[in-house]
């Protein structure tokens, strides 16, 4: 019997200067009003809150703010003031001067600077100490992103940070349980350790190492490939059947060849923008779903034990390549997968569990209706001969997919599922997940920037404005295309 397949463990649910010293005249003494204006901010990240670094000169993602202070006409005043910025490692990225609007004998200096919150507070204390009058009028919050995200679980803000997620493996692929078919096979265990080392050494941007599969591994792959290929025409969804021949043509999907992840990743990138990367074993649901947010799918490279080719207690490369990859090449399915991932970023453990369960009963064990017939699109079904037959038989309990109730269904690992969930289409499932995602408690929304391959936190008008600008550009392109089409049709 084929167990439930997913690349996260269901057992772990609970769980932006220069120096101005020589560029300004020595003619002033710092005296008057100091005003702080909120600018933008970006944050580094660690375990919680995606908090910023304490060294602005080495942290391009530290907070940005603007300071306006007035100087009395005395020699050396400005230089003394600016040296305080240098001493406290506050990076000045822009400086301007103007006549004071309050006193004609003074000059106001505007400094756009970049620093961490600690350095900024220390700078203000020095300015107060060296001047007679300093009035500090900051907005209600500076570095609001840092403060608002302080209690939010850490999540990757750029695609390269998936290295951290990928290496936080809960169960390594080389750690086999006593009832695993390969537990007593030392040669197989050493082979699994090799695949773990490959995955743990991999970093974002590198080509995925090519594996020279053994004759035994290729033979095992061949058995699985042959048996499942017989069922696909009558059991798999149309999107799967459309992409499978393309994988044969471009990625070497054959009975006598185990495809390479690098070839598969390049193919997916051209088809749907997805990519794959090797992983050493089970990830937590949070880390696995974070990969989907960046259109990155974590894949194992090892092959199941040859003693039982039609069974594996954990996801192997047969499951990944035959179950997941053909659907990840479909743009609509790829979008559906990414939206589940995006909804998980910064969510509570409880909400991540609900999202992971919805993932389980859709992307792993989902059914859809096509031409009046039930068809499978879940990877756990499409890589399991026995459960694929069972799920489409009269013996299976099939329910309509509704995230609110589906998220409460128990996920079974070593037996067939007690219920399967059907959607009319990927689009319907996606819309239902979008509505469900609105119930997730987060003090912000997120937006994936495909140009920088980063996640932008949308929590104020400034951050939302950037997304609106992109939407305007896209709408202008659509309107231009419609106008040209109307001209061509004479409308």
From Swiss-Prot:
It catalyses: (6R)-L-erythro-5,6,7,8-tetrahydrobiopterin + L-tryptophan + O2 = 5-hydroxy-L-tryptophan + (4aS,6R)-4a-hydroxy-L-erythro-5,6,7,8-tetrahydrobiopterin. Its cofactor is Fe(2+). Pfam families: Biopterin_H. Residues 66-141 form the ACT domain. Its EC number is 1.14.16.4. GO terms for molecular function: iron ion binding; tryptophan 5-monooxygenase activity. Residues 33-63 are annotated as: Disordered. It is an enzyme of class 1 (oxidoreductase). Pathway: Aromatic compound metabolism; serotonin biosynthesis; serotonin from L-tryptophan: step 1/2. InterPro entries: ACT-like_dom_sf, ACT_dom, ArAA_hydroxylase, ArAA_hydroxylase_Fe/CU_BS, ArAA_hydroxylase_sf, Aro-AA_hydroxylase_C_sf, Aromatic-AA_hydroxylase_C, Trp_5_mOase. Keywords: Iron, Metal-binding, Monooxygenase, Oxidoreductase, Phosphoprotein, Serotonin biosynthesis. Gene3D superfamilies: Aromatic amino acid hydroxylase (1.10.800.10). The keyword Metal-binding applies. The modification Phosphoserine is found at residue 19. Fe cation binds at residues 319, 324, 364. PROSITE patterns: ACT, BH4_AAA_HYDROXYL_1, BH4_AAA_HYDROXYL_2. The keyword Oxidoreductase applies. Interacts with DNAJC12. Belongs to the biopterin-dependent aromatic amino acid hydroxylase family. This is Tryptophan 5-hydroxylase 2. It comes from Equus caballus. The lineage of its organism: Eukaryota, Metazoa, Chordata, Craniata, Vertebrata.
């Amino acid at each position: 019997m084929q167990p439930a397949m997913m690349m996260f463990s269901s057992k772990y649910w609970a769980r932006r200067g220069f120096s101005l010293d020589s560029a300004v005249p020595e003619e002033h003494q710092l005296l008057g009003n100091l005003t702080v204006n909120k600018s933008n901010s970006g944050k580094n990240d660690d375990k919680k809150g995606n908090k910023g670094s304490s060294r602005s000169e080495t942290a391009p993602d530290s907070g940005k703010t603007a300071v306006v202070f007035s100087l009395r006409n005395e020699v050396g005043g400005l230089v003394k003031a600016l040296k305080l910025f240098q001493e406290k490692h506050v990076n000045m990225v822009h400086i301007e001067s103007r006549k004071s609007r309050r006193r004609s004998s003074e000059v106001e200096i505007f400094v756009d600077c970049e620093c961490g919150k600690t350095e900024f507070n220390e700078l203000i204390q020095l300015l107060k100490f060296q001047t007679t009058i300093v009035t500090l009028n900051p907005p209600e919050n500076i570095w609001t992103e840092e403060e608002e995200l302080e209690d939010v679980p850490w999540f990757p803000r750029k695609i390269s940070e998936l290295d951290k997620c990928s290496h936080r493996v809960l169960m390594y692929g080389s750690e086999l349980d006593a009832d695993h078919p390969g537990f007593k096979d030392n040669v197989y265990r050493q082979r699994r350790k090799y695949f773990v080392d490959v995955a743990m050494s991999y970093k974002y941007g590198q080509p995925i190492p090519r594996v020279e599969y053994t004759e035994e591994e290729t033979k095992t792959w061949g058995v699985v490939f042959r048996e499942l290929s017989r069922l696909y025409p009558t059991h798999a969804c149309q999107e799967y059947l459309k992409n499978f021949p393309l994988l044969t043509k471009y990625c070497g999907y054959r009975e006598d060849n185990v495809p390479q992840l690098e070839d598969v990743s390049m193919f997916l990138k051209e088809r749907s923008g997805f990519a794959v990367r090797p992983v050493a074993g089970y990830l937590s649901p949070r880390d696995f779903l974070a990969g989907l947010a960046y259109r990155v799918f974590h894949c194992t490279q090892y092959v199941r034990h040859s003693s039982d080719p039609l069974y594996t207690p954990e996801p192997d490369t047969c499951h990944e390549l035959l179950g997941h990859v053909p659907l990840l090449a479909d743009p609509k399915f790829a979008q559906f997968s990414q939206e589940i991932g995006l909804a998980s970023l910064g969510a509570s453990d409880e909400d991540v569990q609900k999202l992971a369960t919805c993932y389980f009963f859709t992307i792993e064990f989902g059914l859809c209706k096509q031409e009046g017939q039930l068809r499978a699109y879940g990877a756990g079904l499409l890589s399991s001969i026995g459960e694929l037959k069972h799920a489409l038989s009269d013996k299976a309990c099939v329910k309509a997919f509704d995230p609110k109730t589906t998220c409460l269904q128990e996920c079974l690992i070593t037996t067939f599922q007690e219920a399967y969930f059907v959607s009319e289409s990927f689009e319907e499932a996606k819309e239902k997940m979008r509505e469900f995602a609105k119930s997730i408690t987060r003090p912000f929304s997120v937006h994936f920037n495909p140009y920088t391959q980063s996640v932008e936190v949308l929590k104020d008008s400034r951050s939302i404005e950037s997304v609106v600008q992109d939407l305007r550009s896209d709408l202008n392109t659509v309107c231009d295309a419609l106008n040209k089409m109307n001209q061509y049709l004479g409308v």
